[in-house]
Amino acid sequence: MKPSTPLRAVAILMAVGDIGHTSGVLRTIPRSLAEGGLLAPLQNFHIVMMGTSRTHWDFYVGFGLAVTFQFLTVAGLAWLTANLADTEPQRAKPFIWLMLAAQSAGLVIGYVYFFAAPLVMTLLTMILLVWSLVQLGMIGSPASGTREVRDGRSATGLDAA
């Protein structure tokens, strides 16, 4: 299996998560009178921030849409990192670790503030990222030592003697 496979799966998973997240953010019709009673104050209570009047609802929608674009950014980053993993695995490593760190933080946040679906998506994403590191021989494999790359330098960046 190519090292890019789990990273492409991460990209697809993030895109699917983005669709779910966006559909939740854009849903503005209350499902019940009680929910409508909760949303009305959020939509009507104004706060002046730096000279601009905003409602709590504005913040809810704005932050939700910002997260939507962050999902897409991570999906794109995972796809581009997959390309890199096949051609220059050592250069892909920091991007994979960065995504894994971000997903770890997301797992904690999801556990504290959200529900099962984001937790499951985050855990699957983390498993795929770890799998990509294993495929690249960067964790859990004796192949994680120094390897020669095309330009004659070792994978550690030090010139071979």
Residue ranges and their predicted role:
Residues 142-161:
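Short, intrinsically disordered terminal tails adjacent to the first/last structured region
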Residues 30-42, 88:
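Juxtamembrane non-transmembrane "cap" segments at the membrane-aqueous interface
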Residues 124-136:
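Alpha-helical transmembrane segments and their membrane-interface exit regions
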Residues 83-84, 134-148:
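Membrane-interface capping segments at transmembrane-helix boundaries
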Residues 87-125:
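Hydrophobic alpha-helical transmembrane segments of integral membrane proteins
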Residues 7-32:
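N-terminal signal-anchor transmembrane alpha helix
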Residues 44-60:
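Juxtamembrane membrane-water interface segments that cap and precede transmembrane helices
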Residues 62-99:
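Mid-chain, well-packed structural core segment of small domains
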